[in-house]
């Protein structure tokens, strides 16, 4: 049970620290408003998948490219901030769950509208 608790604590800590690094340390004017929505860790804690959402949907690919190009920098910043034995390798991915949530909301509104018309 203990490794699970450690992994959960590390996941929360990495989410906060990566968000802080993106906000204050990565100085790329092409980056817009980015939210770190989740972090998934591999079982051995060596790989961290960082899920992000971007305010402007047209900037998704560019944002992912910039962040994935800066993942070495993010890793070095994490190494400076945290005292952990293994610093995970980062992979940035777009969080599709937000889009799915909007789509489900749209479908529910359409169903409600259709049922009211009948």
UniProtKB/Swiss-Prot annotation:
Q: Which GO terms describe its cellular component?
A: cytosol
Q: Which keywords annotate this record?
A: Cytoplasm, Ribosome biogenesis
Q: What is its main location?
A: cytoplasm
Its annotated compartments are:
Cytoplasm
Give yes or no: UniProt keyword Cell cycle: no
Give the range the annotation lists for the signal sequence: none
Show the GO MF annotations. ribosomal small subunit binding
One of its GO biological process terms is: maturation of SSU-rRNA
Checking Pfam families in the record gives:
RBFA
The UniProt subunit note reads as follows: Monomer. Binds 30S ribosomal subunits, but not 50S ribosomal subunits or 70S ribosomes.
The similarity comment for this entry is: Belongs to the RbfA family.
What functional role does this protein have? One of several proteins that assist in the late maturation steps of the functional core of the 30S ribosomal subunit. Associates with free 30S ribosomal subunits (but not with 30S subunits that are part of 70S ribosomes or polysomes). Required for efficient processing of 16S rRNA. May interact with the 5'-terminal helix region of 16S rRNA.
Q: What is the protein name given in its UniProt record?
A: Ribosome-binding factor A
Organism, as annotated: Thermodesulfovibrio yellowstonii (strain ATCC 51303 / DSM 11347 / YP87)
Starting at the broadest rank, the lineage of the source organism is:
Bacteria, Pseudomonadati, Nitrospirota, Thermodesulfovibrionia, Thermodesulfovibrionales
Per the record, the gene is: rbfA
């Amino acid at each position: 049970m203990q490794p699970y608790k450690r992994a959960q604590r590390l996941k929360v800590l990495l989410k906060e620290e990566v968000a802080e690094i993106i906000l204050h340390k990565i100085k790329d004017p092409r980056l817009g408003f980015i939210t770190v929505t989740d972090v998934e860790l591999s079982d051995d804690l060596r790989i961290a998948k960082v899920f992000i959402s971007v305010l402007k949907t047209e900037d998704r690919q560019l944002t992912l490219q910039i962040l994935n190009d800066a993942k070495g920098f993010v890793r070095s910043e994490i190494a400076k901030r945290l005292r952990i034995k293994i610093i995970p390798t980062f992979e940035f991915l777009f969080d599709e769950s937000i889009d799915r949530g909007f789509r489900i909301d749209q479908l529910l509104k359409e169903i409600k509208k259709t049922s009211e018309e009948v």
